[in-house]
Amino acid sequence: MKSTLMTASVLILVLLSIVDYASVYAEFIDSEISLERQWINACFNVCMKISSDKKYCKYLCGKN
């Protein structure tokens, strides 16, 4: 009985650490995507001020 309880406790701790890692990783991916969007928008805005060629700026900055 005691070993079953210990095994269950260890399993719960492992599962909780996996869930915690997954949520932190998801936040990291989300913030990385947000930073990429901010960079693309900034690049596009600066390019438009310089060249005013929308098609070229979209190509240069990778904006879809």
UniProtKB/Swiss-Prot annotation:
Pro-peptide region(s): 27-36
| Origin: domain of life | Eukaryota
Q: Where in the cell is it found?
A: Secreted
One of the entry's Gene Ontology molecular-function terms is: potassium channel regulator activity
Sorted keywords for this record are:
Disulfide bond, Ion channel impairing toxin, Neurotoxin, Potassium channel impairing toxin, Secreted, Signal, Toxin, Voltage-gated potassium channel impairing toxin
Q: Which body tissues produce this protein? A: Expressed by the venom gland.
Q: Where is the signal peptide?
A: 1-26
Annotated Gene Ontology cellular component terms: extracellular region
Q: Which residues form a coiled coil?
A: none
Which pairs of positions does the record mark as disulfide bonds?
43-61, 47-57
Function recorded in the entry: Potassium channel inhibitor (Kv).
- What family does this chain come from, according to its entry? Belongs to the short scorpion toxin superfamily. Potassium channel inhibitor kappa-KTx family. Kappa-KTx 3 subfamily.
Q: What is known of its domains?
A: Has the structural arrangement of two alpha-helices stabilized by disulfide bonds (CSalpha/alpha 2(S-S)).
This protein is called what? Potassium channel toxin kappa-KTx 3.1
Q: Which organism is it from?
A: Heterometrus petersii (Asian forest scorpion)
